[in-house]
């Protein structure tokens, strides 16, 4: 498959908000893809490189080169070139890497160059495509969409399912089953504004602690124990205390879903970044375990002793979990059998208050009758947590790409220092409606003081209200922290930059 075809489809997908149109475009692309193309096409569509990080950013790309007139690059050829680029090391490697990139871009048309530049810098902006791509794959192969989605859930990878389905046809989907030792995509929760709203939507439910930890899926098959993150990375070797806790359980074959969390001596959660450090580093595992011990806390059972529980009601799955685990390895919860009863609603609100008092994020309200919808943000799990907001100042903005080409999109956000300067806390383009994006583009152009072709620096005058889920430590930013899941709520033109939140205010919100 020519890279030009993939680049064109990516551009068209980014330009439309219609799900049906996205599905049709991707289905056509999948029909034209050969078996050798699929392992490259799918990650490229998602804006990912199969090789992971290869050390290429905006600076590495250097000056633009004259584009080719005709498309000749294939997706597999580009993939091979990037694999070779990633392996280039040693004395003089930087020059050789730059020359490889220059040669690659010289062979690309203008449209292909734009796509490659976005792919290499993490700027492919075309919306979340996983669910749409699964439906498109079903259309391309003539398979029931529900069967494809379930296969993706069980395989943990759209890429694996696509490779088999396009080669062997719809009948091959039956081979994808829940297997101990092969992680599945985790079930995700949607947001609700309050516990009361969640109770109204779900009916009989469980209200469980929402821990600010690392999602973990644990598989045990006899003596073999493996642990996986929500992105299905194997982290077993970094977590000896998790392996020990699981090895002590009486059941010999199971799949559990839960969280890893680091607790202080007072039983309160330590900062999220400390928990994350245990997953992110392979160095000195024993020392890390001694310095930042983590504990597993589980909330679901997907399989126990040969019984597949995915399609069973949550009430049954939790009963199996309770038979397997002691209380200290399960999240705290309260069951609301009658959500209309005033005393039950009061108890649920009190449970949220107690959870927050213990230092946790909030609660997840779960439908007792719901099956486990792996890989989907379904309506049967609703998370409730306080919304944190800050009034920050826009320091700069990045030019958009894809459907945001021509717009000023990704905001650089800062908090006020005592001397009147600003400390950058992070970036976001989340939460921007089309109308707000248009307004922001026009307004920030008026404030522009410098433009390097990618980042537009602006006068620090515009205040924006930002919602975020918490703070985490970061050596990248001058205040030592950055915002987690920051998104734009609204611009505060009624406020001046002198009224924006201070670095001191931001730091005071750390747990």
Swiss-Prot record:
Keyword ATP-binding: yes
Pfam families for this protein: DNA_ligase_A_C, DNA_ligase_A_M, DNA_ligase_A_N
PROSITE patterns tied to this protein: DNA_LIGASE_A1, DNA_LIGASE_A3
Domain of life: Bacteria
Cofactor: Mg(2+)
Catalytic activity: ATP + (deoxyribonucleotide)n-3'-hydroxyl + 5'-phospho-(deoxyribonucleotide)m = (deoxyribonucleotide)n+m + AMP + diphosphate
Binding site for ATP: 208, 215, 230, 259, 299, 377, 383
EC annotation from Swiss-Prot or TrEMBL: 6.5.1.1
Active site per database record: 210 (n6-amp-lysine intermediate)
Name this protein carries in UniProt: Probable DNA ligase
Lineage, uppermost ranks: Bacteria, Bacillati, Actinomycetota, Actinomycetes, Kitasatosporales
């Amino acid at each position: 498959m020519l890279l030009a075809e993939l680049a064109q489809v990516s551009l068209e997908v980014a330009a439309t908000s219609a799900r049906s149109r996205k599905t049709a475009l991707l289905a056509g692309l999948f029909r034209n893809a050969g078996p050798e193309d699929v392992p490259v096409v799918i990650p490229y569509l998602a804006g990912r490189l199969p090789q992971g990080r290869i050390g290429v950013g905006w600076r590495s790309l250097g000056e633009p080169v004259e584009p080719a007139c005709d498309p000749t690059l294939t997706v597999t050829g580009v993939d091979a070139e990037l694999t070779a680029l990633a392996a280039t090391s040693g004395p003089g490697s930087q020059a050789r890497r730059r020359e490889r990139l220059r040669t690659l871009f010289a062979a690309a048309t203008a449209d292909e160059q734009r796509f490659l530049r976005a792919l290499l810098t993490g700027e492919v902006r075309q919306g979340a495509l996983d669910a749409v791509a699964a439906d498109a794959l079903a259309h391309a192969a003539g398979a029931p969409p529900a069967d494809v989605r379930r296969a993706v859930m069980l395989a943990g990878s759209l890429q694996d399912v696509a490779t088999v389905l396009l080669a062997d046809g719809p009948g091959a989907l039956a081979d994808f089953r829940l297997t101990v030792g092969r992680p599945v995509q985790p079930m995700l929760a949607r947001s609700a504004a309050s516990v009361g709203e969640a109770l109204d939507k779900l009916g009989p439910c469980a209200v469980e602690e929402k821990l600010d930890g690392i999602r973990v899926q644990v598989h045990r098959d006899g003596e073999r124990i493996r642990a996986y993150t929500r992105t299905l990375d194997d982290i077993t070797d970094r977590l000896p205390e998790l392996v020990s806790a699981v090895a002590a359980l009486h059941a010999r074959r199971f799949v559990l879903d839960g969280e890893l969390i680091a607790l202080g001596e007072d039983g309160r959660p330590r900062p999220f970044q400390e928990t994350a450090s245990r997953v992110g580093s392979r160095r000195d595992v024993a020392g890390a375990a001694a310095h930042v011990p983590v504990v597993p806390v589980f909330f679901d059972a997907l399989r126990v002793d040969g019984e597949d529980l995915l399609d069973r009601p949550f009430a049954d799955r939790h009963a199996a979990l309770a038979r397997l685990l002691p209380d200290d390895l399960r999240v705290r919860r309260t069951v609301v059998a009658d959500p209309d009863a005033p005393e039950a609603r009061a108890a649920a609100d009190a449970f949220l208050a107690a959870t927050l008092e213990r230092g946790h994020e909030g609660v997840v309200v779960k439908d007792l009758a719901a099956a486990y919808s792996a890989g989907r943000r379904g309506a049967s799990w609703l998370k409730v947590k306080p919304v944190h907001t800050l009034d920050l100042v826009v320091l700069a903005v990045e030019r958009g790409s894809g459907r945001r080409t021509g717009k000023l999109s990704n905001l650089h956000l800062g908090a006020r220092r005592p001397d009147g300067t600003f400390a950058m806390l992070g970036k976001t383009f989340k939460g921007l409606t089309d109308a707000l994006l248009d307004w922001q583009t026009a307004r920030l152009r008026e404030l522009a003081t410098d433009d390097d072709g990618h980042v537009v620096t602006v006068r620090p005058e515009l205040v924006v209200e930002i919602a975020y889920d918490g703070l985490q430590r970061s050596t990248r930013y001058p205040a030592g922290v950055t915002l987690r899941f920051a998104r734009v709520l609204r611009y505060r033109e009624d406020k001046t930059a002198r009224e924006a939140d201070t670095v001191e205010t931001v730091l005071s919100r750390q747990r």
